Amino acid sequence: MLTKRQLLVLKEIIRLFTESGQPVGSKTLMQELPVHVSSATIRNDMAALEDAGLITKTHSSSGRVPSTQGYRYYLDHLVEPVRVSRHDLATIKQELGQRYSKMDEIVAQSVQILSNLTSYTAISLGPEVNNIKLTGFRLVPLGNHQVMAILVTNNGNVENQVFTVPPSISSDELEKAIRIVNDQLVGLPLVQVAQRLRTDVPSMLMQYLTSPDGFLDIFGNVLKSAASERFYVGGRLNLMDYLGDSDIHELKKIMSLIDADHGDLTELLGGPIRQTPVQVRLGPELKPIDLANLSLITASYDVGGHGTGMIALLGPTQMPYSKMIGLLDVFREELAKRLTDYYANFDQ
């Protein structure tokens, strides 16, 4: 059981490391702690925190840095969101208050505003995507092994693309595959359809197709076209500012994930959207890939009958969580207000 002073030391180590990026030693803590404590006492407290796995020693310094477990404890029990500055709040209101002709423009601008305010990478999922469901899928033969794939959603949107079907897939096999799609996936939100394409649907198709890849490519591409426009990413290049040369592999992983199909991005954001407060997931907790040196802060925003969207910040593990959590909480409220005002023009 940690003492109040030891928790105060942990909180201060995280604050100082977040601000400087440098390991924190007992002398620095003695100067910065809001209570007078001897250097020896601080060293004992640091030893207790290290034994608990909350801080760790670096090879290049006698100071300590927070561990992933330490960050998690801090986020679960100690973090206190900081109030957004007047300047940042004014910027958010001014930028979101501009004239927009489409909902997508507001959501697209939101990630630019957030990435500019934080210097991190912002990701947003528009509210309507949570309500868009698959209502039908069919293939129309065009001859010469070509088909037109038609995907229909409950908001009246019809996506169609022309594809070349591999000669190895017969028309009977295609019909069986289409029946599986309509039996298993119709009525589901597009984000869930995308996830099932990566999990259990391929094994179902294997019962009728020698290789389901050709059919999955056709269906997956037209599905991506129907939903990908609802995802927006701002500040991609900001990743390069806090991932050094030694993290080039991590940079490649996250870039490929952002550019992949929207099912991967949905999984990164935590799956189908639910109304939740601001949440933080650390690198090892992220899916579908472990991003060891990164953290993701997510927050949902509710637009009444028009659905629930999500806004997220992707940044380094040592980001200032108190400030970012406070900012994201206010930002989602302002974004929800702006979208509600936008929809009010159509609901009258």
UniProtKB/Swiss-Prot annotation:
The keyword Transcription regulation applies. One of its GO terms (molecular function) is DNA-binding transcription factor activity. Keywords: Repressor, Stress response, Transcription, Transcription regulation. GO terms for biological process: negative regulation of DNA-templated transcription. It comes from the Bacteria. The keyword Transcription regulation applies. Belongs to the HrcA family. Negative regulator of class I heat shock genes (grpE-dnaK-dnaJ and groELS operons). Prevents heat-shock induction of these operons. PANTHER family: HEAT-INDUCIBLE TRANSCRIPTION REPRESSOR HRCA (PTHR34824:SF1). This is Heat-inducible transcription repressor HrcA.
